[in-house]
């Protein structure tokens, strides 16, 4: 990971409008760059936009493949945030709220998008971004990158290939004293 010791300077305000309902990048300090199929992560508080606007109309008409991939990314980020050793009370609140929005609206957003369920998925993605900005993602995201790079699989779909296996592994190997939520 390339950390913020790059001495980056902000010369202007950054205002963003997400065009998917998935990554929550509008509230995170992380970026990913691929060079020759090698993933480089950049992390700096200076990467967090100064402002953002969640506009359902820009997301509502996306192809179903993009909706399913980005929606699953938000769901996975929330689940991973809950499982992360770096989770905090604040990240857990964000992750649980995100999952509530996601699990209530994902199927309708995918099948019959309305401004209401699309807005809910945009909020879910934003909350998942807030959660992982604190806790970071864990193994399911890390393992997904080769699937995207070498098999041209979308990010959310790549994560979906292995999340279940990690959940099962962690469930079977959990410390029973930690199973409070």
Residue ranges and their predicted role:
Residues 149-181:
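Gly/Pro-rich interdomain helix-loop hinge
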Residues 30-135:
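Carboxylate- and glycine-rich phosphate/diphosphate-binding segment that chelates Mg2+/Mn2+
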Residues 72, 99, 140, 159-160, ...:
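A general structural signal for well-ordered alpha-helical segments in protein cores
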Residues 2-34:
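Proline/glycine-rich low-complexity loops and linkers
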Residues 1, 78-79, 102-105, 125-128, ...:
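Buried hydrophobic packing segments
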